[in-house]
Regions:
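Extended hydrophobic leader/signal-anchor segments used for secretion and membrane insertion
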Residues: 1-143
Length: 143
């Protein structure tokens, strides 16, 4: 089967529309910012619009035409702070109304589905995350 790549500026608004209608959407995210839990070119995510988002949720957000799929690491009223699991620093901020959907399932190759964790342990490992990610990228992915 041929692979079709649709630019985010076309795809994501349509995904947002489907999610707003109450539908679930399965898509394959691009980029390595959610390694090691969501792997580019291997994993798909299933998104759903939820009434309430919580710290630890992985969300798809619209940052003014730039779209990211990152984890909520802090919540202050209507304001959210996001960070990719594969990042060692650098965060994004947005308001809750910019959340298009929440990852409810990660689909691995072969069709096995896993429910995403809240990432509490991974957040606690932030001081050593750079070393864990280096090991993952240099060694684990080669196995």
């Amino acid at each position: 089967m041929d692979k079709i790549t649709i630019p985010n500026e076309i795809l994501i608004p349509e995904v947002g529309r489907l999610l707003a209608e109450g539908r679930e959407v399965e898509m394959r995210p691009k980029g390595n910012s959610m390694l090691p839990f969501i792997r580019q070119e291997k994993d798909n995510v299933v998104l759903k619009k939820k009434d309430k988002v919580d710290k630890g949720d992985i969300v798809l957000v619209d940052l003014g035409g730039r779209y990211v799929l990152h984890r909520i690491i802090a919540e202050d009223g209507e304001r959210l702070t996001l960070m990719g699991d594969g990042n060692v620093r650098g965060t994004e901020s947005c308001t809750k109304d910019k959340v298009l959907g929440t990852v409810v399932k990660i689909v691995r190759p072969g069709g096995k589905s896993v429910t995403p964790s809240k990432g509490k342990l991974w957040k606690a490992l932030l001081p050593v995350r750079r070393y864990l990610l280096a090991f993952y990228r240099r060694v684990w992915t080669k196995i």
